[in-house]
């Protein structure tokens, strides 16, 4: 349906914008960009999807395996996992910083802040690779709580997990849960420190 809608818009506006067209999008929009190109290859001159997931089911499972075994080098994957473990080991010291951050940003969640903190730490590996951030910029594990926390918040803002009433992408999450699918988290290396259990 989205590809048909885009084709109708392109057809309607062709007389106003007669030159070459570009289609782009991120996440679901990236997928839509690819579908649009597949169904209407002559509508646009360029298709530029930024992150265009093609999940095979509601619980795809490929992302976790890829991040655990294939993303980057073994040393990079270990550095990311070590950072995540350190952030979880320090959770009791990080929670006052996290609670303050949440309060300063007027964030509200459906679950306890400790659960959201876990999700932020779990999201870190996917987010780092998705946005192409350099692994060598991860601070030393001997850095202060404040330095490690600031780095984590820069890379994974907890606004991603906002209460549905405050999240303008709620409709996407509903569709992802019911139709499109979404990635999960590999929690095995972290279970002893997590408050979230699945």
What are these regions (language model features)?
Residues 27-28, 51-54, 181:
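Short, flexible loop/turn elements at secondary-structure junctions
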Residues 25-35:
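Glycine-rich nucleophile elbow surrounding the catalytic serine of serine-hydrolase chemistry
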Residues 15, 36-45:
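Short, surface-exposed basic-aromatic patches at helix termini and helix-loop junctions that form
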Residues 22-24, 46-49, 176-178:
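Structural recognition of the beta-strand scaffold that forms the well-ordered cores
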Residues 43-100:
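A catalytic-pocket lid/entrance helix-loop region that shapes and gates access to the active site
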Residues 17-27:
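Alpha/beta-hydrolase fold nucleophile elbow
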Residues 100-198:
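Alpha/beta-hydrolase fold active-site neighborhood
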Residues 1-16:
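Alpha/beta-hydrolase active-site loop
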């Amino acid at each position: 349906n989205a590809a048909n809608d885009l084709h109708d818009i392109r057809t309607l506006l062709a007389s106003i914008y007669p030159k070459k067209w570009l289609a782009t999008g991120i996440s679901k929009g990236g997928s839509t960009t690819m579908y649009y190109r597949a169904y209407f290859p002559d509508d646009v001159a360029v298709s530029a999807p930024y992150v265009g997931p093609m999940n095979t089911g509601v619980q795809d499972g490929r992302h976790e395996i890829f991040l655990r075994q294939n993303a980057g080098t073994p040393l990079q994957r270990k550095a990311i996992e070590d950072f995540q473990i350190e952030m979880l080991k320090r959770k009791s010291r990080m929670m006052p910083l996290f609670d303050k951050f949440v309060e300063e940003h007027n964030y509200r969640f459906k679950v306890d802040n400790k659960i959201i903190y876990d999700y932020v730490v779990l999201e870190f590996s996917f987010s780092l690779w998705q946005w192409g951030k350099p692994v060598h910029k991860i601070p030393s594990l001997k850095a202060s709580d404040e330095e490690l926390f600031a780095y984590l918040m820069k890379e994974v803002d907890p606004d991603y997990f906002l209460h549905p009433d405050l999240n303008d992408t709620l409709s996407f999450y509903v569709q992802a849960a019911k139709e499109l699918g979404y990635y999960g988290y590999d929690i095995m290396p972290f279970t002893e420190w997590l408050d979230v259990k699945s």
